[in-house]
Amino acid sequence: MPRSTAEIAQRARETGRLGIDTEFMGEGRYQPLLCLAQIALDDGDGGTEVIVLDPLTEEYDPAPLAEILADPAIEIVLHAARQDVALLRRDWGSPVTNVFDTQVAAGFAGMRAQLGYEPLLKETLGVRLRKSASFTRWDDRPLTEEQLGYAREDVLHLLQVASVLQDRLTALGRLEWAREECRAFEAIDDKRDLDVVFGKLPRINSLEPAQRAVARELVEWREEAARTGDRPVSSVLHDAALIEIAKRRPASVDRLRQIRGLNDATLHRRGKQIVEAVARGRERDGIPVEGVRPSQPDAEDAPIIALGEALVRSRAMESELAYELIAARADLQRIVTSVREGEPEPEVRTLQGWRREVVGEELLELLSGRRTLRVGPDHRVEISSSE
């Protein structure tokens, strides 16, 4: 069995793939703490070798593994890859390429979207996992044999599941569709998009432009304070208090003290910083309401969006594809808005690649009035020309 990360990397090069899972702790931190990395390798005899790396107690060189993650010739197999990819990219300092996510693949193979690893194993291999250690303090040391057994079992069958799904997708002609979907993981990192954070603040639309400018400055200050102190963002300043501060724009700690939701510890430790952030926000240009995306569609669009959803769900069922893989409600809203306003097609995934082939073209014709939707005699949704 490989012992060093260099030996693990060499075996991955020889076999062309590597399975990986991580255990981490996110509670009480700004960023999750990597506690274990479990690696699965083909053993050359149809079985799997599992190696568990412990970054909290072992000194190991991640560089050889980082090279493997970045090598497009080597397939990296994960399940529900988003968090793992972001964590490995940050801690091992490497992009992650050629990802094959078994959760994504299951959606293309006729199973439900976001299928958990345990039901996926049961459905594909008839294997049942023990989950007694799934909610555990992975940062405690020493780990028990039960915890280590759970960690090993989490990747023991991963490569076999990937092979089964790839065979199914090849038979369905959808393997490249799944690989195309998995390529999106290459751009994932663990950096929070502050534009999104700002846009999702409660009651942000109720603030005046100058108040929104202060709110944006507070968002940026809060993020840096949380990152520097490795604390959850909400423990630095929760959203409701942030909005109230932006609304009142206090110029002193005494004024700040009048706002509900700020305890004495926060005022003592961060009061001056908050007031300084408010002052910087006052100097910023106002942010007009048009700069904040509405969270709800126009009421007049709701039935049209529902019509589009009906078509997408029908085509998803016919194609044995998970609906969530084809369209998101936000995509449908953007398509409906663009058709209504006579704007160019929006760049949404429903109108691109294989999705356009499955339903995107029909969706545009339906929403533009060139096609109609009805229930056929076999109780299936039919789309036909409106002429």
Regions found by a protein language model. Give the residues of each.
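Short, glycine/acidic-enriched capping/hinge loops at junctions between secondary-structure elements
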Residues: R29-L33, V52-D54
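Alpha-helix N-cap/helix-start motif
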Residues: R29-Y30, G110-Q114, L267
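Active-site-proximal helix-loop-helix substrate-binding element of RNase H-like nuclease domains
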Residues: Q38-L159, Q166, F185-E186, D298
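N-terminal accessory regions of nucleic-acid-interacting proteins
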Residues: M1-L18, T22
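Accessory DNA-binding and partner-docking regions appended to nucleic-acid-acting proteins
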Residues: E145, V155, V161-E387
